[in-house]
């Protein structure tokens, strides 16, 4: 057993809130080689692979554009008060999309893609929670050349 180190006395834990009353959506940033950064938004979960129900906008994005993106998806009706469920916090979702777009633009030379999936949209007044996020850095950013 010589040379084997004991495990550290300190341990790290990640504790997260369990979200059970949110509606799953996704948002993603991708880079088109000709047109630049674009934002995709749609209903989350496995259904997006089947339904292809999403909206797409080139950046920059204003909050009004974000509301329009949300409204043009077929799944937008799920964000309304339906089947005894409260309405989702669409205003917070629109702000989330706008902040994501602003972040991508401010870091455009560093980012190729961003994927937020799922974003849990909570009942009105309670906001949104990003449950999983992935950022793919650009291989040849101006920051790396400096």
Predicted regions, residues:
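ATP-dependent carboxylate/acyl-activation modules
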Residues: 1-146
């Amino acid at each position: 057993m010589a040379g084997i180190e004991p495990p550290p006395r300190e341990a790290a834990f990640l504790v997260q809130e369990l979200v059970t009353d949110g509606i799953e959506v996704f948002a993603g940033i991708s880079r088109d080689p000709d047109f630049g950064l674009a934002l995709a938004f749609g209903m989350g979960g496995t259904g997006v692979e089947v339904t292809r129900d999403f909206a797409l906008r080139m950046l920059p994005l204003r909050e009004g554009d974000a509301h329009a993106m949300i409204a043009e998806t077929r799944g937008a009706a799920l964000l309304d008060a339906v089947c005894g469920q409260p309405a989702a916090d669409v205003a917070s979702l629109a702000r989330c999309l706008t902040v994501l777009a602003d972040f991508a633009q401010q870091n455009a030379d560093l980012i190729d893609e961003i994927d937020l999936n799922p974003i849990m949209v909570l009942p009105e007044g309670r906001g949104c929670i990003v449950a999983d996020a992935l950022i793919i850095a650009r291989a040849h950013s101006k920051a790396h050349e400096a």
